[in-house]
Regions:
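Hydrophobic alpha-helical interaction segments
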Residues: 99-107, 115
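Compact, glycine/acidic-enriched structural inserts
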Residues: 59-100
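A surface-exposed partner-binding patch
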Residues: 1-65, 91-92, 98, 116-162
């Protein structure tokens, strides 16, 4: 049985429409964990799995507004897709780490206002083909996950510590 991530990859969608672009030539930033497996990118932000955490999805942001470069976004890839369906793209989800609830709500409104028909079509396609629904209360879900996260399984290159 294929994992949801494998099913997602087989859809061959234009990931840039949900800020989850597939990149062939990956530039490795200092904060990208050495034990990470890339899912997709939004500019320099890498979304990934990290080996000891199974299906948990992380953001790795070299230009973070928070006090950490790597942080969890979803317990599973299925939840990650549900968050994308709820928020329209990875962008609002990734920014929860430094936002309060009011900032997040305002950001979501702004994202919704500029969402294109092509983006809406991709979101509808994902929902139907993967058989998942938007996740309720994305802000609370992500904040709860981040508040109890043990990052001791994340491995960095020597460059990170320099």
């Amino acid at each position: 049985m294929k994992t949801l991530f494998e099913r997602y990859k087989k859809l061959n969608i234009n990931g840039s429409l949900i800020c989850l672009e597939q990149v062939e030539d990956i530039y490795s930033y200092f904060c990208y964990p050495t034990n990470a497996k890339a899912i997709g990118f939004e500019g320099s932000i890498m979304y990934c799995f990290i080996e000891p955490y199974g299906d948990m999805v992380f953001a790795c942001n070299p230009d973070t507004c928070a006090d950490v470069f790597v942080y969890p976004l979803a317990k599973t890839f299925e939840d990650f897709m549900g968050l994308i369906l709820a928020c329209g793209s990875t962008n609002p989800i990734e920014q929860i780490v430094w936002m309060n609830k009011e900032q997040f709500a305002k950001h979501l409104q702004g994202e919704e206002a500029v969402r294109t028909e092509e983006q809406r079509a991709v979101l509808n396609h994902l929902e139907k083909k993967l058989g998942i629904s938007p996740l309720d209360n994305p802000y609370d879900y992500v904040k709860e996950l981040q508040s109890h996260f043990d990052n001791s399984g994340i491995e960095y290159s020597d460059e990170y510590y320099d």
